[in-house]
């Protein structure tokens, strides 16, 4: 693993000299191996160690290098064709392999190779980008998008039209992370490396980036970049000091209770 990491780190330092025609075989093989590990869930761009999220920068670099090393090519896809550098995850998968994976994929859902989809996950017509990690039992609902290298936990529900930000463009230091058992309401956006901690519930139409104020109405505290464990969050606004206008914010209105959980619980009938 250390040799693989070093090969990718060195190649990234010299990425300006690389092209599909000129890339050394060792670099190409290293990037391919890293992407295969991401695809199988054997490696993650970010992982929790001793309670803290740690970013594996070298894997993010491998994802970026793959765009340098590969030409666009025709990708066959049902009723149409595509022209891209990254093949589709399930393009060469047969029915036995899909059954073994425990994943359900509803047309025309798309996942790029290099994304991991865990057992029991359901992809409604949605999009999962390269380097993303979608853990077991998670529902990615219709028109939801999981950005490059985003980390989605177990038994998460990403409702219709949800956007989870990626790291590739604009280039972000850390991926967006949705921890286990979270519910993200329809048309909400969580981007720029924001962390939504375990069991949180984000209401419909909430937008959270690193500069978004997260206001706790019980304590009056304003925080940024992280939604606390078990918080229930709705869209709101905070007035300017001079009272001339208000600006958007996300508001923590309470902690998840039994009533909230009953409304956002996982429906096992919909799982594979």
Curated annotation (Swiss-Prot):
Record-linked InterPro entries: DapD_Trfase_Hexpep_rpt_fam, Hexapep, Hexapep_transf_CS, THP_succinylTrfase_dom1, THP_succinylTrfase_N_sf, Trimer_LpxA-like_sf
Associated pathway: Amino-acid biosynthesis; L-lysine biosynthesis via DAP pathway; LL-2,6-diaminopimelate from (S)-tetrahydrodipicolinate (succinylase route): step 1/3
Enzyme class, first EC level, given as a word: transferase
Keyword Cytoplasm among record annotations: yes
Pfam families: Hexapep_2, THDPS_N_2
GO molecular function, one term: nucleotidyltransferase activity
Location within or outside the cell: Cytoplasm
EC number per UniProt: 2.3.1.117
Amino-acid biosynthesis is among the record's keywords: yes
Catalysed conversion reaction: (S)-2,3,4,5-tetrahydrodipicolinate + succinyl-CoA + H2O = (S)-2-succinylamino-6-oxoheptanedioate + CoA
A single Gene Ontology CC term: cytoplasm
Paired cysteines (S-S): none
UniProt record, GO biological process: diaminopimelate biosynthetic process; lysine biosynthetic process via diaminopimelate
UniProt entry keywords in alphabetical sequence: Acyltransferase, Amino-acid biosynthesis, Cytoplasm, Diaminopimelate biosynthesis, Lysine biosynthesis, Repeat, Transferase
Amino-acid positions noted as binding substrate in the UniProt annotation, renumbered to this chain: 104, 141
Oligomeric and partner information: Homotrimer.
Similarity section: Belongs to the transferase hexapeptide repeat family.
Protein name: 2,3,4,5-tetrahydropyridine-2,6-dicarboxylate N-succinyltransferase
Gene for this chain: dapD
């Amino acid at each position: 693993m250390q040799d693989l990491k070093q090969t990718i780190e060195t190649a990234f330092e010299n990425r300006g000299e690389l092209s599909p025609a000129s890339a050394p075989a060792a670099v190409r093989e290293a990037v391919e191996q890293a992407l295969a590990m991401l695809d199988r869930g054997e490696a993650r761009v970010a992982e929790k160690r001793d309670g803290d999220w740690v970013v594996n920068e070298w894997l993010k670099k491998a994802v970026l290098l793959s765009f340098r090393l590969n030409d666009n090519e025709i990708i066959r896809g049902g009723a149409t064709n595509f022209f891209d550098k990254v093949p589709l995850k399930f393009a060469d998968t047969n029915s036995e392999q899909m059954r073994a994976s425990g994943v359900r994929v509803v047309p025309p859902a798309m996942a790029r190779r290099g994304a991991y989809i865990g057992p029991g996950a359901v992809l409604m017509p949605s999009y999962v980008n390269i380097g993303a990690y979608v853990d077991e039992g998670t529902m990615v609902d219709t028109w939801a998008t999981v950005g490059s290298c985003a980390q989605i936990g177990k038994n998460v529900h990403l409702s219709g039209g949800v956007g989870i930000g990626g790291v590739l463009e604009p280039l972000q230091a850390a991926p967006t992370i949705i921890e286990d058992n979270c519910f993200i309401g329809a048309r909400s956006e969580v981007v720029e490396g924001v962390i939504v901690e375990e069991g949180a519930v984000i209401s419909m139409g909430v937008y959270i980036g690193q500069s978004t104020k997260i206001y706790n109405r019980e304590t009056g505290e304003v925080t940024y970049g992280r939604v606390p464990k078990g918080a229930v969050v709705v869209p709101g606004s905070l007035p300017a000091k001079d009272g001339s206008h208000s600006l958007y914010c996300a508001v923590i209105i309470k902690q998840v209770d039994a009533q909230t959980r009953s409304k956002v619980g996982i429906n096992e009938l919909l799982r594979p």
